[in-house]
Amino acid sequence: IDIDRAEINKNIMIDQPVIGDVKEVLTRLLPMINERPADEWNADIEALKAKYPLTYDESALTGPYVVEEIYRATKGEAIISTDVGQHQMWAAQYYKYTKPHTLLTSGGLGTMGYGLGACIGAKMACPDKTVINIAGDGCFRMNLQELATASRYNIPIIQVVINNHVLGMVRQWQTLFYGKRYSQ
């Protein structure tokens, strides 16, 4: 959906473009959606999770372990934001989200540095909630100015940095798909 016809097919080819104001378009589309209960689908997903549980090396301080400990400490009641990288995947997989609007992430958009600003915004919107940003060392270096903002305005957020001394997801892809040809 885009209000500007010139944007359609500009960067990627669109199968079904919709030209218009997003509010108006969605207002017209929403009544056409038939709500389907997801109970059966959710049960299937839970069965797959039970059959193929996520595992990691529990003898070392790993990213998944850190995320699970954050979950235990917060009893799942925190709002979690993430930057981009392996820590983002661990936060999505190892923190057990049970409520909507408790995972703030840019998904696959690759926006390093997103998490801390999102964390600050969430804390401003929900001052009574514990709000935690989970970042890797690479992402953490992207936005120290936001940390200064949180400090200056006394915004009580929690910043967790999972430091593996490398851009972890980039390194993982180079290992898996590029014959261990690493960029420096």
Question: Could you describe each region identified by the protein language model?
Answer:
Residues 1-4, 21-22, 44, 70, ...:
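Fold-independent oxyanion-binding glycine-rich loops
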Residues 1-44:
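Glycine-rich, acidic loop regions that bind phosphate or pyrophosphate groups
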Residues 9-13, 147-149, 169-178:
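Active-site-proximal loop->helix
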Residues 12, 16-19, 38, 52-61, ...:
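Hydrophobic alpha-helical scaffolding
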Residues 25, 175-184:
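Conserved thiamine diphosphate
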Residues 46-123:
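Active-site diphosphate/adenylate-binding microenvironment
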Residues 89-167:
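Thiamine diphosphate
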